[in-house]
Amino acid sequence: MDMRRASMCMMLICVSLVLLSGFGQFVICSEEKGTYNDNVVKMKLGGFSDSKNDWNGGKEIDDIALFAVQEHNRRENAVLELARVLKATEQVVAGKLYRLTLEVIEAGEKKIYEAKVWVKPWMNFKQLQEFKNIIPSFTISDLGFKPDGNGFDWRSVSTNNPEVQEAAKHAMKSLQQKSNSLFPYKLIDIILARAKVVEERVKFELLLKLERGNKLEKFMVEVMKDQTGKYE
């Protein structure tokens, strides 16, 4: 009887160990699976956001923009010349996908193009994925002549328009030059924008939200731009 009881005890111990081992593996697998899912969530791709690089004169963005124009010229046997980068946004992929709004010179005329460039810095890899001409939201000719006693009527324009954003940057710099504060202005938002034509020049009226130090301020500004692209 004692031998039989001892055998039964040993069998129960073995079964218990097997069950515990299986449960432990299940827990480990579950934890690993949970960790894997967490990593997947962390790596989910987001939308485009403003580039962290300085796109107003930043060397990295300028290099990517120049690559886009040169690659387009090579593919299409074109002779476009990069003038400047108007806007740069980026999206995290396997590397980064840059979306650039470019001002280029084509046959002596300024035109706006949008380029998408895929970059993997660790592989020294760049690929032009898209390069297309963008028709501006408005020009002097298509604003239309609407006499109101003073010339042209005001027209509401998109705050995302590259021309509006350039005018806002110019206005912010002008405010900074006139300011005696040690804190520089930072453009937070273009709240409203409208434009009209005055003697072959575009006049912008913008409501800007600016940050200076810890203080938010709103400014209504007017900016003039002539046909050569010069601001007043």
Curated annotation (Swiss-Prot):
Record key words, sorted: Phosphoprotein, Plant defense, Protease inhibitor, Repeat, Secreted, Signal, Thiol protease inhibitor
SUPFAM superfamilies hit by this protein: Cystatin/monellin
Localization annotation: Secreted
GO cellular component, as recorded: extracellular region
Span of the signal peptide: 1-29
Motif Secondary area of contact, residue range(s) on this chain: 91-95
InterPro entries to which the protein is assigned, alphabetical: Cystatin, Cystatin_dom, Cystatin_sf, Prot_inh_cystat_CS
Family annotation (PROSITE patterns): CYSTATIN
Site (Reactive site): G46
Main localization, broad class: secreted
Cystatin domain: residues covered: 46-135, 152-214
Positions where Phosphoserine occurs in the chain: S181
One Pfam short name: Cystatin
GO BP of this protein: defense response
SMART domains registered for this protein in UniProt: CY (SM00043)
Chain's role: Specific inhibitor of cysteine proteinases. Probably involved in the regulation of endogenous processes and in defense against pests and pathogens.
PANTHER family: CYSTATIN FAMILY MEMBER, CYSTEINE PROTEINASE INHIBITOR 7
Protein name: Cysteine proteinase inhibitor 7
Gene this chain is encoded by: CYS7
